[in-house]
């Protein structure tokens, strides 16, 4: 249970932990603490959800470690059905359960004696950005929300990239998924969809696939638990349940949207920013693409995140 894509900082401790969400699924997580943390006092804490199909040994662990270096208690977790977390079938995806995983992380952090449960914030990376925002709409224990390279998976599934999916194409997709349910039932196991990150890619690969492949399919970000695939029929739930319907209800708790200036996903952050109520901020990383915000510590604005959480978890 290792294969971390980054080295552990000498000033940080990392402890594997586990706990159950409200569905009884065991969540595997890593708790990061400053090595000199005074556990007799209560401290602010931040939970970090990984990119869609990512695991805690990748980008979310990098975020957790860097925030622990700056004095925060930080928790990186594997979503249900993925990584080292429990749940069957493997690699299923669910809007409700992935949102619940954030509240379960709050349950865990808020019951640690060294955590001030009134000062818990969260970071959602890529698809987890949408799940965290959705969780914060109803879970008021989450006092401050930041997203990095946010993607609204429900919008992507229902409308396609840049909302390009026509009504006819959507209906045809739903017909195919309905037939897939019959096939899964007869086979006794759900089929997986295509990889989001191609294993072999070159200059002829579509730019988004090439970008994901440059992270997930190379030594830069590869982890055996991050297969970048979900069960095919997972899309049906996302096509039926939009994640950000109540985003205005997060106010007056603050939201920080971070996106790469050159990211294909930038429009998700911009549109969510427009829909959200104050206080809110949109921070564009100059020259940054989508996966730059997964692991590039020279690009990820950790000083901005530290300022945001220090102010709003005071």
What is each residue range found by the language model?
Residues 133-214:
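Alpha/beta-hydrolase-fold enzymes
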Residues 66-86:
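Conserved alpha/beta-hydrolase
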Residues 250, 256-259:
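Short beta-strand/loop motif that positions the catalytic acidic residue
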Residues 53-65, 79:
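The serine-hydrolase catalytic nucleophile loop
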Residues 288-299:
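Catalytic histidine-centered segment of alpha/beta-hydrolase-like enzymes
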Residues 2-41, 294:
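N-terminal cap/lid segment of alpha/beta-hydrolase-fold proteins
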Residues 113-126:
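Alpha/beta-hydrolase fold nucleophile elbow
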